Amino acid sequence: MARGKFITFEGIDGAGKTTHLGWFRDRLEQKVAPAGRSVVMTREPGGTKLGESLRDILLHEAMDLETEALLMFAARREHLAQVIEPALARGDWVLSDRFTDATFAYQGGGRGLPRDKLEALERWVQGGFQPDLTVLFDVPPDTASERRSAARAPDRFESESDAFFARTRAEYLRRAEEAPYRFAIIDSTRSIADIQKQLEDLIASL
């Protein structure tokens, strides 16, 4: 069986990506199941026993900026080795809530970690591995802030300022501009129905 495809959902907290994950997974299953493939839905940080333990630390414990980035990539290496690569090799498709673009956006854009340090970690952990498709849910920081305030108690990242999320969003958009061949940008201020229509079109194009 041919290798599967790797799809990631990205966006600042409050962009609405999680709202569409389960729906997208179900539609994707309908597309690939006739060929005997499955869709593995996962997340970062997380996706493995070790990754989920690191996720709890990353979301709730204060730490040095470089420590934060190193833990993100440590969780990612385990995620690739234990979940993503094996699934793709057996022909399944993988749908992940965040991947490396989030680290460049949050630790790089938001926190200001130099890009060359993140690029060095990316080369070490991933080689040249990248998603086949990255769906970026884009929304202004003030809109995202309103959505977050109506949700559950915020974690360490969700509690950041609008200025932090403006920098994070800008880095996401810079990444998308650099790699238009794999990015699809979703205007997440639109209705759920309009967004899902665009997602349907993306699935049909895969």
UniProtKB/Swiss-Prot annotation:
InterPro entries: P-loop_NTPase, Thymidylate_kin-like_dom, Thymidylate_kinase. GO terms for cellular component: cytosol. CDD domains: TMPK. Its EC number is 2.7.4.9. It catalyses: dTMP + ATP = dTDP + ADP. It comes from the Bacteria. ATP binds at G11, I12, D13, G14, A15, G16, K17, T18. Phosphorylation of dTMP to form dTDP in both de novo and salvage pathways of dTTP synthesis. HAMAP family: Thymidylate_kinase. This is Thymidylate kinase.
